[in-house]
């Protein structure tokens, strides 16, 4: 929102006025091990991993499951940050992926990873925007970088980590 945009402008002004070397990265929907997975502050990948790990018959998903999101694994994001820090680029830049999946596809993938036979219940709740995309053209052009880790493999690691700590 506005607070992010104003912060970006403030960092750029600070760079101009004081000669500070600044990089501004706009992160996508990040997931991975060592993140929050309970308590109401977790994002959908961690919440779904936790729900699947705890479930015996079904999981609840807010909305109709058709919401589309691009997800980036934390290790890929860290590689992107490193590429940005090694560059001279000082304008805001999106760090993310062009690949998006629906929340239903995400839930089905996590259920498959778990080896369980679970049903998905769609319930009323906050769903956010139906589709969120991230334009990564500048990232690819300027940084000569893009995420490389397969989504399923990354979710396998995340699921196993969350399952271990439940």
Spell out what each predicted region is:
Residues 8, 27, 42, 89, ...:
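ATP/adenylate-binding site constellation spanning eukaryotic-like Ser/Thr protein kinases
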Residues 12, 34-37, 143:
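Short, function-defining helix-loop hinge/capping sites that tune catalysis or transport
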Residues 23-44, 68:
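Flexible, glycine-rich beta-alpha linker
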Residues 1-8, 38-46, 70-71, 100:
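Short-chain dehydrogenase/reductase
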Residues 1-26, 47-56:
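Active-site Tyr-X1-5-Lys
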Residues 54-166:
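C-terminal substrate-binding subdomain of Rossmann-fold SDR/epimerase-dehydratase oxidoreductases
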């Amino acid at each position: 929102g506005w607070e992010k945009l104003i912060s970006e402008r403030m960092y750029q002004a600070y760079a101009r006025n004081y000669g500070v070397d600044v990089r501004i990265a706009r992160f996508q929907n990040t997931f991975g091990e060592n993140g929050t997975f309970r308590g109401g502050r977790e994002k959908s990948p961690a919440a779904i991993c936790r729900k699947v790990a705890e479930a015996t018959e079904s999981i609840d998903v807010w909305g109709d499951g058709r919401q589309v999101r691009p997800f980036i694994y934390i290790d890929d994001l860290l590689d992107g940050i490193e590429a940005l820090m090694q560059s001279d680029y000082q304008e805001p830049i999106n760090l993310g992926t062009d690949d998006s999946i629906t929340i239903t596809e995400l839930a089905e993938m996590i259920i498959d990873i778990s080896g369980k036979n679970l049903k998905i219940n769609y319930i009323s709740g906050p769903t956010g925007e139906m589709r969120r995309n991230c334009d990564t053209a500048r990232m690819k052009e300027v940084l000569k970088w893009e995420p490389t880790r397969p989504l399923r493999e990354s979710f396998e690691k995340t699921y196993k980590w969350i399952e271990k700590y439940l």
